[in-house]
Amino acid sequence: MLERSLLLATLLSALCSANLFGNNSYVYYYQSAFRPSDGWHLHGGAYEVVNVSTESSNAGTTGCTAGAIYWSKNFSAASVAMTAPQNGMSWSTEQFCTAHCNFTDFVVFVTHCYKSGHGSCPLTGLIPQNHIRISAMKNSSLFYNLTVAVTKYPRFKSLQCVNNMTSVYLNGDLVFTSNETKDVSAAGVHFKAGGPITYKVMREVKALAYFVNGTAQDVILCDGSPTGLLACQYNTGNFSDGFYPFTNSSLVKEKFIVYRESSVNTTLELTNFTFSNVSNATPNTGGVQTIQLYQTITAQSGYYNLNFSFLSSFIYKASDYMYGSYHPSCKFRLETINNGLWFNSLSVSLGYGPIQGGCKQSVFANRATCCYAYSYNGPSLCKGVYRGELTKSFECGLLVFVTKTDGSRIQTRNEPFTLTQHNYNNITLDRCVEYNIYGRVGQGFITNVTNYAINYNYLADGGMAILDTSGAIDIFVVQGEYGLNYYKVNPCEDVNQQFVVSGGKLVGILTSRNETGSQPLENQFYIKIINGTRRSRRSITGNVTNCPYVTYGKFCIKPDGSISTIVPKELEHFVAPLLNVTENVLIPDSFNLTVTDEYIQTRMDKVQINCLQYVCGNSLECRKLFQQYGPVCDNILSVVNSVGQKEDMELLYFYSSTKPSGFNTPVLSNVSTGEFNISLLLTPPSSASGRSFIEDLLFTSVESVGLPTDDAYKKCTAGPLGFLKDLACAREYNGLLVLPPIITAEMQTLYTSSLVASMAFGGITSAGAIPFATQLQARINHLGITQSLLFKNQEKIAASFNKAIGHMQEGFRSTSLALQQIQDVVNKQSSILTETMASLNKNFGAISSVLQDIYQQLDSIQADAQVDRIITGRLSSLSVLASAKQAEYYRVSQQRELATQKINECVKSQSIRYSFCGNGRHVLTIPQNAPNGIVFIHFTYTPESFVNVTAIVGFCVNPANASQYAIVPANGRGIFIQVNGSYYITARDMYMPRDITAGDIVTLTSCQANYVSVNKTVITTFVDNDDFDFDDELSKWWNDTKHELPDFDEFNYTVPILDIGSEIDRIQGVIQGLNDSLIDLETLSILKTYIKWPWYVWLAIAFLTIIFILVLCWIFFMTGCCGCCCGCFGIIPLMSKCGKKSSYYTTFDNDVVYEQYRPKKSV
């Protein structure tokens, strides 16, 4: 059982109790009628304390008032517990009076009241002595009363209010409940002394309880702690050692939307109304009330366009006291009414009445807010509107009445209004959010992967998103200011998070996320858990040779959460097995060396299954539905975990049993590569050559291409006057005199002087030009030969390089074929995994394989029915995967056993088993690493020809003076053979006849074989020849049959054998081809000639040195701070001067320098 962070105590006898546990950190309630079966059950009923406060007294000095509610604290909580000190409080006005719980609609309280009289016991009335009252009140009326003797509750200890069924517990016993479930809105205890009262506010959490005979014996809170997450996700508190994937679904508080367009234009409806002139309109008969209205329009909310185009044939009459228009409340004309004016209400009508006073009087009579008058030179048939003019006739005109109020419900416009909505994609990164990406909704952890995806032109053809195998968005793209931005949608919680259980305890978490306090463990990160909380990072300590607990790769995770490295005990020594020779009359006498390649798989790829994530993905509805499936995921996971654990243990044992001591010790000396030339990979030995560093600094060097003879020339001209021997040191190359083409200044002066002197006296001194001409011809020869060799070498390099490239390409092809065969073996492991992932795209009879689409298209009940099919199908796929991995483990386990035998028998020694290490008699085996396995290269010798000899089982010896005895070959010595009438002994596997010696035989006491004598009744299946004719019976069955042995070369082995022999031969040919491509170039050399600087450069260096010394001396004299420099430079006369100058300052013990004041000398 898991060790939990909270102290889980056994709940006491009462099934209706509610006691605080875990250092008063939580409480567990359950009804008396709830008696589940034995085992773990996940349901509500647990409440965790989130806030604690205390109160000393609230009754004042006169005592508390019994039978009334005088004190209350406001809450909004699922449960509130009010507890007194351990000894409790007495039922008296000097200590405790009333405690209550307010569930908004009604109040439940417990009190006592033994007084009578006016104002006493206002809520309950007189209560009998030594009794308490438990009541419930609604709208000031008591609807529940329970009177209990104080013998049951001698003192007040606690009152707990719970929202579930509005339950109230007194001293841990259920005293009130109803069929309503409401949170606690207020509660309080009215008391004077005996406190303090502790208020504990709690929130409701699910709990996993372990019941025995209907009583909860153990409780694990589903509160987000590691223990709660693990137990409540797998519905059990008992876990064996292993790894358990989990998903921590946190509350998502943020949401964002990714829009297809950056902006959306919406054109709102524009209501058009066109006014027109009314023909045959009736004039008014007197007063404004008789003016008849036409074409009345009342605008609703929205946009309107009022067309008064017919007014172009009318003449507007401005306001002139009583005459014309009157619209002081309207600052617009009808011609401009569509210029974006806002109204809260608007009504427009046409009328025909007198221009004289018709508009003004209509506004005063509240028939309109504004009135516009227009003349069309009409007849004078309209009557007046004022009291003295009602019978008079005036000119009729068009009157436009506008009734309006200001506001923003109505707007007039000339054109339809276009509303532009700018969509800003504010994508929330690096935390769990709800998203709506191009219409697909879900939850995810969004990361920016633009830097990784920008170079691969993903979605470059206008695509918006890449979906994963389940149909959810995997990668989506958003057009940014500077180009496309790519984002990756990850699950909110790490899919690879796994709890680690070791020794029955939850000790850590394995995650693929590098969190604070984690430490690397293979390809994951490990977080240690102590007492239910995460602990800071600790390094891996100690080594162990074996691990009885849970292992991850080469690491052992112990029950205390610490990690140790598994270092298998190395094999100290090994010996070769003895020969086990069998008999054969055909003995081989000649052999061939054979190379056989064999691939054996020694490890399998482990898988980590997050069952809940695979089945439901990020769908919360699916996860709720999946809880009905019980421990099916636990069963699948247990199979996969056990396979992984066994795989790790056997793999460690495999390496520990085959790795000899000193295996990792490098050999760095006496390395022989045989005929393989790897000198290009080695650093050539350094040797001192060339001039010194000073010479390289003081001289200018010139390098040129030279011939092999240039080294001898350089040695010949070495020395201060070497340039004088230039022509004497000339060398011959292929019969031609050659000199390096570089001429120094000394040589140039020498040859020029010789040439000029030879021309001074004509033919007499002409012989002086011979040295000049000779050295010139030699240098031209050098240039010509060098250019010719360079051209030839270029042709050789090109031809050889082309040949080498061809061989390298062929080598790469051969290597790829060999690797392809290994890959075919390895890829068999992933076929079932590929099929499992492909199942995510199958709908298994549902309308879609995408869970989000199903819940969006159907209601809850229909969607659950469809998703139930997908859950069943995906669970079946996971079961197939688990079974396949289990079968693969058994096969790989057998392969490892075979590989262990191969290493011990073939690699570490010579096998005596024929054709076990390759084909034939074993000589040598070289192992090589391969993906998920080992390739063995077996060198064996196989028989080419045989000698047919007569084999003798043994000899029976009959001595003259003793009883007879028999001799047979000793085990492993061979067999007796007869050759030309003589007897020899020879090995069974190689024909080497030799004389028989005493060490080759074993003496038997008798020449006869021992048999057991029995009668006929013992062996009932034996028949005589008279009763049964074998020849006749066998002829019935064996006629027309062929007696041929099967062709074992075509036998279908279950062990995958990798044959790369032909590829190895091809690679060997390529190596030979590369060796043939070595280039034998004509040897050239680099000639380096040093040119001395001119005399004026040396003169400038000398002047600069002198100036530097003078400036340095001047600084010493002027500053008086020459110090030790005088002595260092050996300037003895200056030392006294420096001493006198520096003595002007005196340094005291406090390291403060003062200037000494010397007395002035009189002149």
From Swiss-Prot:
The record marks R538, S539, R691, S692 as: Cleavage. GO terms for biological process: endocytosis involved in viral entry into host cell; fusion of virus membrane with host endosome membrane; fusion of virus membrane with host plasma membrane; receptor-mediated virion attachment to host cell. A motif (Di-lysine motif) lies at residues 1160-1163. Residues 823-867, 1056-1084 form a coiled coil. GO terms for cellular component: host cell endoplasmic reticulum-Golgi intermediate compartment membrane; membrane; viral envelope; virion membrane. The di-lysine motif confers endoplasmic reticulum localization for type I membrane proteins. Homotrimer; each monomer consists of a S1 and a S2 subunit. The resulting peplomers protrude from the virus surface as spikes. Belongs to the gammacoronaviruses spike protein family. This is Spike glycoprotein. It comes from Avian infectious bronchitis virus (strain 6/82) (IBV).
